[in-house]
């Protein structure tokens, strides 16, 4: 009986550490979002004054970010979701800690912000998954919590919930992307972390909708036909993107391996140059996250016809360049804008 107060105290200390980790995920996600927005605004500010600047800044930025990700912070490349999935699947040990370390959090946030400052077609939502998973893993290590896999899943879901200000999105993401078999003992951990992270995001940024609001409604068989068409087109584009990303990525690895010292810098610099050229040709539309353009499209403003192919190519090139950054926001912008043109075409036919 004397041990009960001690056990109860340990239980509540662990519980407080868990809640504190969830609060930290939400707060860091909001700060990351603000830093990313500021970096993107800075890029568009100097791009509007010196329209040829991306031809120099973007290749140099890509080369620096790829070099730092490969040599200084290995494991920070790409969106961050594959790293979170891998960390959850591998056994406990140094490999898991390396993928989800505090150092990796700073690297992921910092390099993604630098990439956006250089005009990269990346998003912050994917990196937020790795950051959220890393924070919750550190909580598990510091307080001796045993369920590391469950906390990685919870941190990833909370990251998505805070990034999109949508708690339900975090739960769905946890089931669909991170864990095909949702363990019963993990349910409470995930839900609690998502709710706390979402409330922090709500408290710091207010009640906003990620892509704005729309009064559009599906009407008649023609409207449902457009739903089927958009879904099919989105699936085909997504499949094509994934296939090209894997094939080009494999080719790039073999090409760089011939002379890693020279080609390891030349390859991302060439990717950055291509992104810069696409951005200039598209009047700046393909630079950055694409969030503003997608939000405008949802609210009924039809962007230029060349936005979605330019954004598709810029995002693909960026995804295979080896720099840190997500593909969530750019991919969503491609889908949103391509639909607006299908809708406009339907209106013309009517």
Regions found by a protein language model. Name each.
Residues 1-343, 349:
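Alpha-helical transmembrane segments and immediately membrane-proximal extracytoplasmic
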């Amino acid at each position: 009986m004397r041990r009960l107060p001690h056990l109860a105290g340990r239980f509540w200390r662990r519980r407080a550490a868990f809640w504190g980790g969830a609060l930290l995920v939400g707060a860091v996600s909001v700060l990351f979002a603000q830093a990313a927005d500021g970096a993107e605004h800075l890029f568009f500010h100097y791009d509007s004054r010196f329209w040829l600047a991306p031809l120099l800044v973007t290749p140099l930025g890509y080369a620096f970010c790829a070099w730092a990700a490969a040599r200084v912070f290995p494991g920070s490349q790409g969106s961050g979701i594959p790293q979170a999935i891998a960390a959850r699947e591998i056994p406990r040990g140094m490999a898991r800690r390396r993928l989800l370390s505090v150092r990796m959090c700073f690297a992921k946030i910092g390099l993604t912000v630098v990439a956006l400052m250089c005009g990269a077609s990346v998003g912050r939502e994917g990196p937020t998954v790795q950051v959220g998973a890393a924070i919750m893993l550190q909580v598990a290590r510091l307080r001796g919590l045993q369920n590391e896999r469950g906390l990685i899943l919870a941190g990833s879901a909370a990251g998505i919930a805070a990034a999109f200000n949508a708690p339900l999105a975090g739960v769905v993401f946890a089931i669909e992307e991170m864990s095909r078999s949702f363990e019963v003992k993990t349910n409470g951990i995930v839900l609690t972390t998502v709710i706390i992270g979402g409330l922090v995001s709500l408290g710091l940024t207010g009640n906003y909708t990620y892509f704005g609001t729309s009064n559009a409604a599906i009407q008649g068989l023609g409207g449902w036909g457009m739903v089927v068409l958009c879904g099919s087109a989105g699936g085909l584009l997504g499949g094509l993107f994934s296939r090209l990303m894997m094939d080009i990525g494999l080719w790039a690895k073999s090409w760089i391996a011939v002379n890693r010292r020279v080609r390891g810098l030349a390859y991302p610099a060439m990717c950055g140059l291509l992104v810069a050229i696409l951005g200039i040709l598209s009047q700046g539309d393909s630079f950055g996250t694409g969030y503003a353009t997608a939000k405008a499209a949802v609210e009924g403003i039809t962007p230029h016809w060349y936005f979605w192919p330019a954004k598709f190519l810029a995002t693909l090139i960026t995804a295979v360049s080896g720099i840190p950054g997500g593909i969530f926001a750019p991919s969503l912008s491609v889908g949103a804008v391509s639909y607006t043109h299908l809708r406009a075409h339907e209106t013309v036919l009517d």
